[in-house]
């Protein structure tokens, strides 16, 4: 029975018994910061079990996509080495939310296994929690399981809880006896042994208690059921194999690895491990990227990168040099696409993400391996078998080797790693990043902010609804030190009880404007936010003296605030347009919003075409012309996400969030300032589109008056070009093309003439060929315009000299240039690179190259004759 058939039968079985089939949730959990990846079927029903969410069903079943790699559930290092560990797996589950309980759950499980799947009852064993007599009685009396096949285990194995407090309860597991051949051989081997003989296939969790902070268990009014059965494990049982990797779910992918590598699975255990690793990781990577994860250096993205790079390492061990993982997507799609159609829909996107990451790692993999091999040899010679932390860090920081990848590589050499030393290096780097202000005096400023905050000093932002406010001065800071007052000419930081100035955050620059007291006037150049509720004004005292405690009149510059608001709302519209034109994979990777421009970094894997840029620009300007209202509301985080608001994964949000909705176009969580309607943006113009990192593009744009100024500048430049080209009639491209065509024609004529001159010159030069040590040598100083002409001349001479060595010297642009060319027949005897390295110091320079052609440059052209003479001597001494 295939894995797909088992999945289908399971869901059908429970649907026929009143369960709603619920599609798998994404692997990336929505609005659950406690969870890196979905790792169990119950994840998407967590709020149902907690009583925080009511659904229109009380019975559910699902086949859930799961990943366990990183954090508490980390199977990565065992993947490929054991029969059952995976990073990606599917969990079949049935759930009851206050509906049925132990009696029905046990009956369902036993019926499905013994009647639908027809498993031999004599090979099935069960376990219950030590004190759960109720479950033991149901198994024995209701289902007829002999007492000798019912095992009791303690809290560690058979009691489940969601946390230190809250819903919890006993669980009951079902085991399948795979036979003595799969066991450890011990006469004491039984259920609970760590060997593979008695394999757990299904776990039934009975949530019947609420655990209080003091550990007291109170019965729940409506107990629930959460069960899980690994599809890979039950498939192994049904297909008569003892390894999940031998099931049809994974064998099809392994066969794809065989085709790519030319190796046969089952012939060599080391190759088999690598094939299993690649097959497993291909599934995990494909589903993770499909569900929205992207490779990065932190969080979920870093776990994904670790999985990909571990697969790349094992591909190299199989002799696969070119990007390989991207080709595995086809195999995963073939095996899983019917059950998960999103794989088919996003196939090309998944391949692009994987290829970009593989190419990035390929650039450093060989160099990193060479360094690691050298280090292993050095440590072995020193009598040590531990790779030091600083080496691990250098491999991570310079070559992109995750620490577990390094551990995996050196394990076969009998080495371990100094993980604690690595963490110390990482912490030093984090400390350096935290103190990047050090040396400028800014570290003192950082300390003073902490001191102010610890004293309870805060600054409330009141600038959403107005650009002015009256507030007392709470603190004045000069050169990182808190002072009582400041006088004209001094640059200071100022904290007030409330302020209309937006403190820089979320990519938006801080406001500028002015602050006045009865005795002073200050110009504010910006505002920052060292803490979410502490805003600091950066100001210069222009007149008078300002003191702590003074009443201040704070006024934000309206033109700059309005320009910033236009650019910020336009950024939201830009992201919406990019997603429409390029695809839903577009996600914000960074942004900058200031009065004069906006900058938006986003995930995309190829440069945008001119047509795509135009479509995005047209869409945004269409949104602007529609003059859609920009509505800002406060709501709880869960409601905002459910309503479809876009949020940044790594951003920290509170329980209540600010939602900015631009008509029906865009809805984002955002704390910035915005226009009241999209029409206020006026005009939107993309200035540049560039790449800033692998898979990250950047758009810079302007709006309103800034965009108009840019367009006018382009018009002025176009008019100036038209005047220079005498194309005032509007035919500038045609005129320019004619000019370029004429230039190309003249270049061809020049090259033709140069060829004739070279031929003539070579004839003259060849008369100077001499024989040195039985080898023809032509050493001459020539006059040429550039290095290309020097190379062209050497090519002509090589064709005419027969067999020989050519050494040319030329003064070009006040610099000495040497070129050595050796005909192919002599390149084994005389190497151009070696010869030029000996001559280059004579002209004050250095050089190198290949055996047949090498060049050098220097600062002393007056020594060219000496260098050419030395060529004769070097050749004679060979």
Curated annotation (Swiss-Prot):
Pfam families: DHHA1, tRNA-synt_2c, tRNA_SAD. Keywords: Aminoacyl-tRNA synthetase, ATP-binding, Cytoplasm, Ligase, Metal-binding, Nucleotide-binding, Protein biosynthesis, RNA-binding, tRNA-binding, Zinc. GO terms for cellular component: cytosol. Zn(2+) binds at residues 568, 572, 670, 674. It is found in: Cytoplasm. SUPFAM superfamilies: Class II aaRS and biotin synthetases, Putative anticodon-binding domain of alanyl-tRNA synthetase (AlaRS), ThrRS/AlaRS common domain, Translation proteins. Its main location: cytoplasm. Its cofactor is Zn(2+). Gene3D superfamilies: 2.40.30.130, 3.10.310.40, 3.30.54.20, 6.10.250.550, Bira Bifunctional Protein, Domain 2, Threonyl-trna Synthetase, Chain A, domain 2. It catalyses: tRNA(Ala) + L-alanine + ATP = L-alanyl-tRNA(Ala) + AMP + diphosphate. The keyword Hydrolase does not apply. Binds 1 zinc ion per subunit. InterPro entries: aa-tRNA-synth_II/BPL/LPL, Ala-tRNA-lgiase_IIc, Ala-tRNA-ligase_IIc_anticod-bd, Ala-tRNA-synth_IIc_core, Ala-tRNA-synth_IIc_N, Ala-tRNA_ligase, Ala_tRNA_ligase_euk/bac, DHHA1_dom. GO terms for biological process: alanyl-tRNA aminoacylation; negative regulation of DNA-templated transcription. GO terms for molecular function: alanine-tRNA ligase activity; aminoacyl-tRNA deacylase activity; ATP binding; tRNA binding; zinc ion binding. Its EC number is 6.1.1.7. The keyword Transmembrane helix does not apply. Consists of three domains; the N-terminal catalytic domain, the editing domain and the C-terminal C-Ala domain. The editing domain removes incorrectly charged amino acids, while the C-Ala domain, along with tRNA(Ala), serves as a bridge to cooperatively bring together the editing and aminoacylation centers thus stimulating deacylation of misacylated tRNAs. Belongs to the class-II aminoacyl-tRNA synthetase family. Catalyzes the attachment of alanine to tRNA(Ala) in a two-step reaction: alanine is first activated by ATP to form Ala-AMP and then transferred to the acceptor end of tRNA(Ala). Also edits incorrectly charged Ser-tRNA(Ala) and Gly-tRNA(Ala) via its editing domain. This is Alanine--tRNA ligase. It comes from Pelobacter propionicus (strain DSM 2379 / NBRC 103807 / OttBd1). The lineage of its organism: Bacteria, Pseudomonadati, Thermodesulfobacteriota, Desulfuromonadia, Desulfuromonadales.
